[in-house]
Amino acid sequence: MQKARIRLSGTDFEKIEMVCDRIKEIAERTGVNLAGPIPLPTKKLVVPTRKSPDGEGTATWDRWQMRVHKRLIDIDADERALRQLMRIQVPKDIGIEIVLES
């Protein structure tokens, strides 16, 4: 049987967990096997910037960072379950990637 590998990524942790919960509910309703969600390493993007606009004075820095959270879910590729997965309302800032594997 084929498996569907679902990869979720985004900057808002709560929204990713909300989408994972919806996928779990679909798997329970349709009776397919589910593995995950497996948390993948969080990527931290750090941008240091100078506080003073002209370069004069002491060198003080602001450190801005953005964290990208990722989750991985494996689910059996049942036609009914995949149809329901396609109908999930995913927030704009959450990336979802579905790959079918044999």
From Swiss-Prot:
InterPro entries: Ribosomal_uS10, Ribosomal_uS10_CS, Ribosomal_uS10_dom, Ribosomal_uS10_dom_sf, Ribosomal_uS10_euk/arc. PROSITE patterns: RIBOSOMAL_S10. The keyword Ribonucleoprotein applies. One of its GO terms (biological process) is translation. SUPFAM superfamilies: Ribosomal protein S10. GO terms for cellular component: small ribosomal subunit. It holds the Pfam family Ribosomal_S10. Transmembrane segments: none annotated. Keywords: Ribonucleoprotein, Ribosomal protein. GO terms for molecular function: structural constituent of ribosome; tRNA binding. Gene3D superfamilies: Ribosomal protein S10 domain. Part of the 30S ribosomal subunit. NCBIfam families: uS10_euk_arch (TIGR01046). Belongs to the universal ribosomal protein uS10 family. Involved in the binding of tRNA to the ribosomes. This is Small ribosomal subunit protein uS10. It comes from Methanoculleus marisnigri (strain ATCC 35101 / DSM 1498 / JR1).
